[in-house]
Amino acid sequence: MKYTVSFEEIVWFDSSCQNDREMASYTQGCLILVGILVTLSLPYSHAFWGNENKIQTAVFLSPKFVLGPGSVENRFYYNVNFPKGHIAVRSFDAEVIDEAGNPIPLHETYLHHWVVVRYYVRKGVEISEFDDPRKFNESDYISGRNSGICQNLGQFFGLGSETRKTSTHVPNPYGIEVGNPTEIPSGFEEQWMLNVHAIDTRGAEDKLGCTECRCDLYNITVDEYGRPLRPDYRGGLLCCYDHTQCKVKHGFEAVRRTLYLRYTVKWVDMDRSVLPVKIYIFDITDGWKRSRCSTGIIAEHECKVEYDIESCDATGIGNDGCIDTRRISLDMPFGGYLIYGVAHQHSGGTGSALYREDGQLMCSSLPTYGEGEEPGNEAGYIVGMTTCYPKPGTVEISKGETLILESNYSRIRHHTGVMGLFYILVADELPKSMHALHTVVQTQDSIMVVTTLWAAVALIGVVAVIVVAAHYRLKREGEDGYEAIGM
């Protein structure tokens, strides 16, 4: 938005104020109006907010992976493409596509999850896309994880089947800061790892069972390292690791196809106008317990990531209100302002929420289920999770405060390997000018920032200028007319 006034108009008003003795009483007002006009002739970004920080966009492809009916891809790709420099990420979106760039529906290739993790590698040490992290020399590799709180959930970005219809937008003036030279260890460089876990369910005997990684459908009794599974482990990540095979219908055939994860990153250059946010991930399976010596730090949190849901029939409970509700209490080892929140759930999920200890709702996230066949609307699958964007400054987390995480699932049928994660962004500070310059209008999935104060000033200024000019001209014309008659 830019209000432009010509130099001639400014001079005309200034000379009018100075040259007409009959307008002496208006001189002060005219000078004020001249000031308003000069101010309004500047772009608002320069007049009030500083230099505009342009949003940049890049689209990347993961290394290709090839899937046939029932097969599984769960690879870790190192040193993947990512924007360079000291930047603030504003969004990170992804989806599975084929070689022609066509989106692949979940009922053909189920995207269990994708995650992006930062790490630092010693300069001169080559890490290929397909390296095994267990072979890394510890002195050459340093984790660049998020701020907490689970030891094994260090990703910066990540979603699952809900990826196409879940907002990852970080509202202005915030951003996820990466590439900060002062944070990169001396002699190291920042790189990124991408993990893609996808399951081809074409022709599967039980599509949902394959996506929930039921061990009987994969005929798995040991994990990917050859260790025997627990007798009570019926399904989850330990049964659908890379190159496993889910059971397909007898005689079903389909071509193997090459796929990619296409990911789109939006960012701005990091400068003083951007306020960095920190990433925290909570897990409903977290085994943390309060004790005299507990501090809530990462080392104290044992997050199992997945759990099972027993059906109502198995527990003798009717279908009415047949919901599995789990709650845990967590003491916050940090403080700040909640900027964004979203949950991650699997099929059967009915929503998740974050509460204060007194029961006050801080943020909720609900699943959207598809109703059709096309990508982004696949019936029976979670195709999106609602997000929360609290009005800046309204939801503050105090260090040491106890929060309650809740995760809900339907128990109409048995589920294995479900998740109950909650991802939040927290800022240490608020923009100093936000309350004076903006009115924040919240919707469930996005925030529309409406610049009102200076627009109102601009409108008032323009109207005032027009009124004064019209009044002066009418008065002058009237006086000229009386003089002519008098002569």
Describe every region a protein language model picked out:
Residues 6, 12-14, 35, 39, ...:
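N-terminal non-cleavable signal-anchor helices
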Residues 453-469:
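Single-pass alpha-helical transmembrane segments
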Residues 477-487:
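Cytoplasmic C-terminal tails of single-pass
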Residues 46-451, 470-474:
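Beta-strand-centric surfaces of beta-sandwich/beta-rich domains
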Residues 1-34:
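Classical eukaryotic N-terminal signal peptides for Sec-dependent ER targeting/secretion
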Residues 12-18, 40, 60, 273:
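Compositionally biased, intrinsically disordered/low-complexity regions enriched for serine, proline
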Residues 27-44, 461-464:
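Cleavable N-terminal signal peptides of Sec/SRP-targeted secreted and luminal proteins
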